[in-house]
Amino acid sequence: MTLRPMASLPLVVSSLSLRLGDGLTVGQYLPRGHIAFARVMNPVRGYGILARSWASYAAGSVKVDATTCWNDLVDAASQDRPDIGTIDPEVAVTLSRILRSHTRTPTDCYFLVWEGYAGLRADVLAAASVELPFGRWMFVLAGDLRDGGETVESVGGRSAQWWMPADAAWAVGNDLYGASVYISGSEELIADILAAHDIEAYRATASMVVIAEEFEP
């Protein structure tokens, strides 16, 4: 385990709630001040199938973009689905590689995970917490960006849902029920994410409404 629990909140995290809005648009959900946005999908996984992109899984039946909800592609009986409320490990590896080139503090990053999950590691439970929109209280961990995909559970593979470097150059945010992750930052960062061949990413806008699966009641 390399991510370490924070005993107190660093300024970039303690001030985070002041820089977030209280609405349901991408620009309000992620910190104000960033100018470009993307949505990255967790790949589809299921019994007997290899990981697939949403677009591949839809096979042309639905046009997949940054506004697509997973439930648009499948019915309730389907056992195939992307991971929910976490960042897929393969996606995390790619994101950490790309994001590293767009911050001055890649070894000094913060990772937030919802405190309501069962099975969290004992050291995670001892971390300081911060409140995000919609009453989401999040434990705060710190470490190198390359460790963002580290599991925060005693048994299981869930990783932190929010990432932010100490210089606040970008933000990665994923709600409790999200099957994807939103990213905000510079235009150069988002261009690099959209150009990556090993993740499924779509350009989002500040005014785009965060889709319903990201905020289930």
Give the label of every model feature segment:
Residues 132-189:
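Amphipathic protein-protein interaction modules
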Residues 1-151:
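Extended, low-hydrophobicity segments enriched in charged/polar residues
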Residues 174-217:
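Alpha-helical oligomerization segments
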Residues 64-69, 74-75, 158-172, 208-217:
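N-terminal low-complexity, intrinsically disordered segments
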Residues 100, 114, 119, 164, ...:
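Aromatic-enriched hydrophobic runs in primary sequence
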